[in-house]
């Protein structure tokens, strides 16, 4: 079973994502803010990270930079899943090591999961 860390401050959306991913065969752990995410990224056997950029304390860019600083997480795929859609946000995410950048309003959860499945085969 693949393990996903969902970093999302919107509790309703986090719940939807977690429920859908669990039904799709993922083991889910969640973080609601950057500080919580920084603690949870050290959990063993995380296969993929789903990261929102708009968080209440650290922003998603800071969390992504921290993830990529840790040797054991450098190769773990990080999908930025955010409502931010400006080119500068996409570029900055890629520069910091995001595997992909998906705009929430452009993808259903089913499409997101299909995309995740191709990444973590």
Question: Where does each model-flagged region fall?
Answer:
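Conserved acidic carboxylate
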Residues: 8
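Two-component/phosphorelay signaling modules centered on CheY-like receiver
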Residues: 11-29
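The feature encodes the CheY-like receiver
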Residues: 14, 56, 74, 86
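Acidic, metal-coordinating helix/loop segments flanking the phosphotransfer/catalytic sites
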Residues: 30-48
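Acidic catalytic/metal-coordinating carboxylates
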Residues: 33, 59-62
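Active-site residues of response regulator receiver
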Residues: 52, 82
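Short amphipathic alpha-helix used as the core "switch/output" element in two-component signaling
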Residues: 61-74
């Amino acid at each position: 079973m693949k393990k996903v860390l969902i970093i999302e401050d919107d509790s309703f959306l986090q719940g939807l994502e977690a429920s859908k991913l669990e039904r799709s065969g993922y083991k889910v752990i969640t973080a609601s803010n950057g500080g919580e995410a920084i603690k949870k990224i050290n959990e063993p056997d995380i296969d993929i990270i789903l990261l929102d950029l708009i968080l209440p304390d650290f922003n998603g860019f800071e969390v992504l930079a921290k993830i990529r600083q840790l040797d054991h997480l450098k190769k773990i795929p990080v999908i930025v899943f955010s409502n931010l859609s400006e080119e500068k946000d996409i570029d900055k995410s890629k520069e910091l090591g995001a595997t992909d950048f998906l705009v929430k309003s452009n993808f259903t959860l089913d499409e997101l999961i299909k995309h995740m499945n191709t990444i973590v085969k």
